Amino acid sequence: MGVVLPPPPLSMLMLVLMLLPVASASEAEHRLFQYLFEDYNEIIRPVANVSHPVIIQFEVSMSQLVKVDEVNQIMETNLWLKQIWNDYKLKWKPSDYQGVEFMRVPAEKIWKPDIVLYNNADGDFQVDDKTKALLKYTGEVTWIPPAIFKSSCKIDVTYFPFDYQNCTMKFGSWSYDKAKIDLVLIGSSMNLKDYWESGEWAIIKAPGYKHEIKYNCCEEIYQDITYSLYIRRLPLFYTINLIIPCLLISFLTVLVFYLPSDCGEKVTLCISVLLSLTVFLLVITETIPSTSLVIPLIGEYLLFTMIFVTLSIVITVFVLNVHYRTPTTHTMPTWVKAVFLNLLPRVMFMTRPTSTEEDAPKTRNFYGAELSNLNCFSRADSKSCKEGYPCQDGTCGYCHHRRVKISNFSANLTRSSSSESVDAVLSLSALSPEIKEAIQSVKYIAENMKAQNVAKEIQDDWKYVAMVIDRIFLWVFILVCILGTAGLFLQPLMARDDT
């Protein structure tokens, strides 16, 4: 008795029914592939008439701007090269192959135009054919291979980091001339719909142009499609890490002239600023394009700052030399007094304290009168004071007062007593040796104090001259810093307006 098998599950039947069309479609594509490539030769140009060219529609899509090497003058890009042409050998009727209208085949199986990058600097000139091409039943072939190109580009870093670059990419057939391949540009510029924004460069525009050139090597005319890539460097990174620190260093250099000379730290501040700038330059050397063709704008600014700081050190040393001058080492010329003590302070609205100027004549008059009195005291003969020999000009107030008293006293004594009494009284007025010695000592001290005050006044004048020089260079360096910075960084704007 036979074994009765149970009927297959419904799910199994449904799965088989679903796989039948897939298998049928795969079989149709297999038959179509065999039909298309049975006698196909990928070396022969796909034209029915040899005299006709193959029309190639060409477009470049920018995927990413990888890098711009300023030193080696190379631009690295990630591109998609869209190429569309018609191959009459790759036509079929969809009805014969279960409605199959499109088919993807390996690119090495079909004929392809040998379009290369003429100005390639490194790597392969031609794209890799590992990607597949899309075939349409009408014979239209669409091939979009991705490629990373390193193209040569003339980099002008004059206005770095505010520079604009124009890099060209020239595509064309290496083997086929105009009679064999006719290149047609799709659109008027590079396709940037799938562009991945770069952190350093911004693409302004990328127009494309078609050229026909006759080279020296050949008689034929060759076509090419050239894209001009206008790019602008994004300066934010360099502004924060290069320009702003240099501006701060320049500002510290200006403050050197505002620092008082008496503090003794002017040269220390100058040297510290110079050392900080030197270390800063060593750190950023690799950031700046190392080229000897032109001096980049940021290099000019760093050189300007270095000269700025060095010049401030030289001027500071000169100012300190003026500040510490004394009457024993230098004599102030008349023109220095006229220019630096009278003219320039008024021009720069500097006001010198008036107390010193008012007290100086009083001090000189006081010491002059006291020394005159001490000279009268030091006379050994009281008769000279009595007769008024040293006091005829009225400069000795003490002698004049003493002479009047002695004259009055002598007159009274004359009326009341004999001449011998008068001589006795006058003899008592003579100074003792101890008093004379004390007067000489006081006179010496007074003369020294007068000389010290005169020397201090001259030293104060030299210090004020140094202060005036400091103030002059303070304003000069502020103007140079502002105008120099503005002049350097306005050059890119002016150059862009000219172009």
Curated annotation (Swiss-Prot):
Residues 1-25 form the signal peptide. Disulfide bonds join C153-C167, C217-C218. Residues 26-244, 280-301, 488-499 are extracellular. Coiled coil: none annotated. Ubiquitinated; by STUB1/CHIP and thereafter degraded by the 26S proteosome complex. It catalyses: K(+)(in) = K(+)(out); Na(+)(in) = Na(+)(out); Ca(2+)(in) = Ca(2+)(out). PROSITE patterns: NEUROTR_ION_CHANNEL. It holds the Pfam family Neur_chan_LBD. One of its GO terms (cellular component) is cholinergic synapse. Keywords: Cell membrane, Disulfide bond, Endoplasmic reticulum, Glycoprotein, Golgi apparatus, Ion channel, Ion transport, Ligand-gated ion channel, Membrane, Metal-binding, Phosphoprotein, Receptor, Signal, Sodium, Synapse, Transmembrane, Transmembrane helix, Transport, Ubl conjugation. It comes from the Eukaryota. The modification Phosphoserine is found at S407, S410. GO terms for molecular function: acetylcholine-gated monoatomic cation-selective channel activity; transmembrane signaling receptor activity; transmitter-gated monoatomic ion channel activity involved in regulation of postsynaptic membrane potential. Glycans are attached at N49, N166. Na(+) binds at E265. It is found in: Synaptic cell membrane; Cell membrane; Endoplasmic reticulum; Golgi apparatus. Its main location: membrane. It is a multi-pass membrane protein. Belongs to the ligand-gated ion channel (TC 1.A.9) family. Acetylcholine receptor (TC 1.A.9.1) subfamily. Alpha-3/CHRNA3 sub-subfamily. Component of neuronal acetylcholine receptors (nAChRs) that function as pentameric, ligand-gated cation channels with high calcium permeability among other activities. nAChRs are excitatory neurotrasnmitter receptors formed by a collection of nAChR subunits known to mediate synaptic transmission in the nervous system and the neuromuscular junction. Each nAchR subunit confers differential attributes to channel properties, including activation, deactivation and desensitization kinetics, pH sensitivity, cation permeability, and binding to allosteric modulators. Neuronal AChR is composed of two different types of subunits: alpha and beta. CHRNA3/Alpha-3 subunit can be combined to CHRNB2/beta-2 or CHRNB4/beta-4 to give rise to functional receptors. Part of a complex composed of STUB1/CHIP, VCP/p97, CHRNA3, and UBXN2A that modulates the ubiquitination and endoplasmic reticulum-associated degradation (ERAD) of CHRNA3. Within the complex UBXN2A acts as a scaffold protein required for the interaction of CHRNA3 with VCP/p97, this interaction also inhibits CHRNA3 ubiquitination by STUB1/CHIP and subsequently ERAD. This is Neuronal acetylcholine receptor subunit alpha-3. The gene is Chrna3.
